[in-house]
């Protein structure tokens, strides 16, 4: 199971707001139910609504904290739909009672039902839905909000990359395994042409110092030009661990912002905020 991180909730306004409101609504319903029960006349069935709603809120907090909504979205919608029915029945019983405490409990259930409806609409929609892209653009990085609807057109030379809410990272191969399968057009930052070019041996590195077999007679290594400009910005939609056998690759975490020098090919030359440079798989990134 994915690791729970409080930053996933605190850094996502939608998760933070909806979870906070649901907790507040549940507390109103719970405390009012206790008061009503002390004076008698509280429907026994509504206690099940209180318990079930508590489980739903805890479950949603775990989903937001572990960022696994795309994995369990079908189960989430099912459980929330059942919770909506249960709370609605309790609302119909409590709001018409003469007791002020019962009406307060009904108000808490109404607020909770509103949050559940929003959750169902969010998790029950397809990943490419416009409202999901708008809501997700505010998560963690404010840069994403500006890119919504105004981002640069993305290259489709190798097909569409996976949606940002895909449950599984795309199948990837190491940069060495892709020799001969990448674009044959020149790419800035690649010595001797694009990766896989016939004019370059598979053992020649794409970045950094050349191998000893390519040294001139005087023993001084050739200078490999590095990109000086990174005009593009990209956001990581998955975490990626660099292949230890390829020193040119860089690791990055989900939602991390990278600067990119060129967006052609399956591997992009990127620079992290720390200044570390290297290549990153293009279908793990989305342009801002």
Swiss-Prot record:
Region listing for Disordered, in residue ranges: 151-228
Membrane-crossing residue ranges in chain numbering: 21-41, 45-65, 71-91, 104-124
Superkingdom of this protein's organism: Eukaryota
Subunit structure: Forms homooligomers.
PROSITE patterns per the UniProt record, alphabetical: SH3
Spans within the Cytoplasmic topological domain: 1-20, 66-70, 125-288
Ranges of biased composition (kind: Polar residues): 162-187, 202-217
CDD domains: SH3_Sho1p
Domain SH3: start-end pairs: 229-288
Protein function: Plasma membrane osmosensor that activates the high osmolarity glycerol (HOG) MAPK signaling pathway in response to high osmolarity.
Stated name of the protein: High osmolarity signaling protein sho1
Extracellular side: 42-44, 92-103
Family of this protein: Belongs to the SHO1 family.
Topology term for the membrane: Multi-pass membrane protein
Pfam families xrefs: SH3_1 (PF00018)
Keywords per UniProt: Cell membrane, Membrane, SH3 domain, Stress response, Transmembrane, Transmembrane helix
Main location (coarse class): membrane
Subcellular location: Cell membrane
Alphabetized InterPro entries for the sequence: SH3-like_dom_sf, SH3_domain, Sho1_SH3
GO cellular component terms, A-Z: plasma membrane
């Amino acid at each position: 199971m994915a690791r729970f991180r409080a930053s996933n909730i605190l850094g996502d306004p939608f998760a933070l707001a909806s979870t906070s409101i649901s907790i507040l609504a549940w507390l109103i319903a719970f405390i009012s139910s206790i008061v009503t029960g002390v004076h008698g006349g509280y429907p026994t069935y509504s206690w099940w609504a209180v318990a079930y709603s508590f489980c739903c809120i805890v479950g949603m907090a775990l989903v937001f904290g572990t960022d696994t909504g795309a994995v369990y979205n079908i189960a989430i919608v099912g459980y929330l739909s059942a919770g909506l029915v249960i709370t609605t029945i309790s609302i119909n019983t409590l709001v018409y009672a003469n007791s002020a405490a019962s009406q307060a409990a009904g108000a808490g259930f109404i607020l909770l039902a509103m949050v559940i409806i929003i959750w169902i609409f969010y998790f029950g929609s397809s990943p490419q839905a416009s409202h999901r892209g708008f809501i997700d653009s505010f998560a963690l990085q404010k840069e994403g909000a500006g890119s919504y609807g105004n981002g640069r057109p993305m290259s489709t030379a190798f097909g569409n990359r996976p949606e940002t809410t895909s449950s599984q990272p795309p199948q990837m191969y190491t940069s060495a395994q892709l020799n001969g399968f990448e674009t044959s057009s020149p790419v800035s930052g690649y010595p001797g042409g694009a990766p896989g070019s016939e004019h370059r041996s598979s053992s020649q590195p794409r970045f950094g110092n050349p191998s000893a077999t390519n040294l001139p007679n005087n023993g001084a290594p050739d200078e490999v030009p590095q990109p000086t400009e990174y005009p593009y910005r990209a956001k990581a939609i998955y975490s990626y661990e660099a292949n230890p056998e390829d020193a040119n690759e860089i690791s990055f975490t989900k939602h991390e912002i990278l600067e990119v020098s060129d967006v052609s090919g399956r591997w992009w030359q990127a620079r992290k905020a720390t200044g570390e440079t290297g290549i990153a798989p293009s279908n793990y990134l989305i342009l801002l």
